[in-house]
A protein has these predicted regions:
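Short, solvent-exposed amphipathic alpha-helices that sit
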Residues: 59-74, 161-165, 188-207, 223, ...
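Short, well-structured alpha-helical segments in soluble
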Residues: 89-104, 220-233
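Hydrophobic alpha-helical
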Residues: 110-126, 197, 209, 213-273
């Protein structure tokens, strides 16, 4: 059977709880590699492993769904595997499992700096396995570096995402203090979002503070509420790395109906909050594409010797009150 083989390590609820926003008109340049030797010819069966960051539920369910759709459309076998707990050693172990299974191609949901993957990428290349990243390209990059350890990168430009968030706040007339929080300090993408937003706000003369949080919504609410008491001039707060629940609770408990909340990625909670006005907008990376495009790019490389000439940017885009209805309509279908 073609499609996605889910490799479970624990019981998980497979109901999709989030989605992505309307696809933007991004383009990709494809170049033919002259004389390239690949692990499969156009007539061979192709086996691709997608090494995820987590179980195929919630946010990561959309990456898995994208990989599944690509497998069905291309007629290839896609195996989705993931570590029980997301650490660099655990994810490397899963990559090694895919290599041991003689995968033709591997796409990894890279969450750490390139240095963490350099050794396993070199070993995959030596074994003749195509190795790509289902994550953001280097900040500001467009054209692929020929010396890149990854065959391709398919993800959102997180530096641009932070700047977009700041731009939207400035367009809303924000002039007071803004707090930007990262709930997962070890995640380089979330930190880049936060840093880029803060830098852009400060460049425009707006006071912007960084706040480190945990992934626990209750602790997030307590931390933000305490910050708001210390800084009553705060006019906006951004959640860069988790669902918006803790921020919504802090807004309600503090009686700050005027507090502008913004976030990243899409959850049912954020869509509802955007619809009723409690949240202004969310920055979306369109993670369905982060699952679909790596499978397509690996398949086309393995069968036809094609490699992307530029990095494929899945975002950033914005979901706000003007388009939230369209996004919600596709959430239950697993595409948004």
């Amino acid at each position: 059977m073609h499609g996605l083989k889910k490799v479970w390590r624990h019981r998980a609820n497979t109901k999709f709880g989030i989605g992505t926003c309307t696809l933007s008109g991004l383009a990709i340049a494809i170049a033919l590699i002259g004389g390239a030797t690949t692990a499969a010819s156009a007539e061979d069966d192709v086996s691709i492993y997608f090494v995820g960051c987590a179980a195929p539920t919630g946010f990561h369910g959309y990456l898995a769904r994208g990989a599944e759709e690509a497998g069905k459309n291309l007629g290839i076998k896609v195996n989705y595997i993931y570590p029980d707990q997301l650490t660099i050693p655990n994810q490397i172990q899963k990559i090694e499992e895919a290599m041991a299974a003689q995968a033709n191609g591997i796409a990894v949901c890279a969450f750490a700096d390139d240095a963490a993957y350099a050794d396993v990428a070199a070993r995959a290349k030596e074994a003749g396995i195509a190795f790509g990243s289902a994550a953001a390209p280097p900040p500001g990059s467009r054209v692929r570096d020929p010396n890149d350890i990854f065959l391709f990168r398919a993800g959102s430009d997180e530096g641009a995402a932070g700047k977009l968030s700041a731009q939207r706040l400035l367009e809303m007339g924000v002039r007071g203090r803004v707090v930007v929080a990262n709930q997962q300090p070890g995640d380089s993408s979330c930190q880049l979002r936060a840093t880029s937003e803060i830098d852009a706000l400060k460049a425009a003369g707006v006071t912007a503070d960084f706040l480190e949080m945990s992934m626990d919504p209750g602790q997030q609410a307590e931390t933000l509420s305490s910050y708001l008491r210390r800084n009553p001039d705060t006019v906006a707060a951004t959640s860069t790395c988790d669902v918006i629940d803790g921020f919504l609770t802090a807004k309600a408990d503090s009686g700050r109906d005027d507090l502008i909340l913004t976030g990243y990625d899409i959850t049912a909670q954020s869509l509802k909050a955007i619809g009723d006005g409690r949240q202004a907008f969310t920055i979306d990376q369109q993670q369905f594409w982060r699952g679909y495009m790596p499978v397509l790019l690996l398949t086309h490389y393995l069968k036809y010797g094609l490699v992307e000439g530029n990095y494929f940017l899945t975002g950033p885009t914005t979901v706000d009150k003007t388009n939230v209805g369209k996004v919600q309509a596709l959430v239950s279908k697993g595409y948004r």
